[in-house]
Each structure stands twice: as C-alpha cells, then as structure tokens.
Amino acid sequence: MKISIRFFNDREVRALWDDDQSKWWFSVLDIVGVLNDENDYAKIRNYWKYLKAKLKKENNQLVRATTQLKLTASDGKKYNTDTLDSNGVVELAKHFPNNRAMKFLDWFLYSDTSIDGQSKKKAYTLFES
C-alpha cells in the first residue's frame, strides 16, 4: 500500500492507496480532527467513538463502511485505525454542519492539491508521456 499525507489548513490527513480495490482510504481520526478543529488526540478519539456509537444506533451505513488499516501514529508506531474511502469521507463530513466541513469538502473533492487531484495530475502526466 502506498501512503500519502496531505495537509488541509496545516493539518495532516493521512491516506493509504489500496491496489486491490484501486482506491484511497483516509484516516477517520484525521478528518474528525480537521472538521472539529481539534488537536487533542484523546478528544478526537472520544468524539469519533461517540459519533460512531450514535450512527451505529441509527443503523447508518457509514459505520459499516469503515475499514481498519494500520497507519503510523505520531509516536512512530503503526496502529489499526478506522479509515473510509472517498464516498465515506463525504458522508462523514455531512455529520459536521459547520463551515469547516464545507471548506474541507471543497478541498477534498475539487482542489488540484487534493489527493485525487494530485493522482489525476500524475495519471495524466504518465498518460501523455
């Protein structure tokens, strides 16, 4: 798997490329931190735990869409963490009705500096060469 780290407003958003499924998986905790503008890992983790339980209770598909993958943490060790694909990230952002969520989605979906934007640029460059 290929690892990619992008920055939204100087905040890290980690992603892994899955060759088997040909798609990116994004760290849920990184996205929750961005959407809540929170730096405290414990608060981010607790909020995701709360939101995940609430969504599970509502039978929301988003919880079933999460996949646990190993990502490198700030301590340098790899831990299993919840990840979502692009569609899941968009759905997750809908549960954060604030301006940050809209700005994040604009960056995530439409920006040339987004992960997909970078991938498309690279693909076009390879295709044209």
Identify the function of each model-found stretch.
Residues 1-129:
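An anion-engaging/catalytic patch
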